[in-house]
């Protein structure tokens, strides 16, 4: 079943998915649930039972807020979301694509850049600068999920989200990549072309008092294609070479630091502005893991 509620063009998106699946010999149906019709569709008992009996449910990409507001209609759990939960309990696979992957978490990142998250913290509303966090669908409570980690420099906002919500782990998915979780989300196998990053916050060292945000020894662990993440231990069993993972992680962190702090170095050169409110220091272990020290002085009026 294809649920394209996250898409701005749900009918067209669902058709594209169904066409692609049929090209692989897989039959699929458009569940035809959108934010515009969910108040009516969630009352259709036949649809609810149809969803509960599905073996695979694909939540297409798009705006994750639109998806969540369709299944948690006006803040309430809909019969449609309960039907998806029933299907999952019976062994169905739930596939979250792009933004829909973020919606699978208990806490969902809905907006904001890494710089805004570090500089302003959690936004009080969508109209302000900062990190937007909303309730997610809760199918993947093990970690907060974020995606497009490289192109959008989202590693920083993922770390801030975990620290702010007291969630130990964050899972960042790189472009054209994902993870396959086992039945209880305790083991994740990285798939695709690039991989994923496991972010681990140390709650005993994290400080959120006043305008200061301090998260030292934030552990980063890169999982390349085929690597298996153990969510209980926070470790990775590697199939891909550690040297490749180390290079990929070091590049991600370097891009984040350049994006949020700049490249002026310890001394500000003439005509170059260095961010005075954010400090990021990274210690690479050379094996696809490392530690990121995060400090920022926040402006609460963003």
What does each of the following model-derived ranges do?
Residues 64-77:
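Glycine/threonine-rich flexible loop motifs
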Residues 58-61, 83-108:
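Catalytic nucleophile loop
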Residues 51-52:
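A short, aliphatic-rich alpha-helical micro-motif
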Residues 8-15, 19-23, 110, 115-302:
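C-terminal and late-domain segments of enzyme folds
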Residues 6-9, 35-38, 63-66, 99-104, ...:
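Solvent-exposed loop/turn segments at secondary-structure junctions
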Residues 1-3, 29-31, 95, 171:
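Hydrophobic/aromatic beta-strand patches that form the interior of the parallel beta-sheet core
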Residues 7, 23-47:
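Functional beta-strand-loop-alpha-helix junction segments that form "active/interaction loops"
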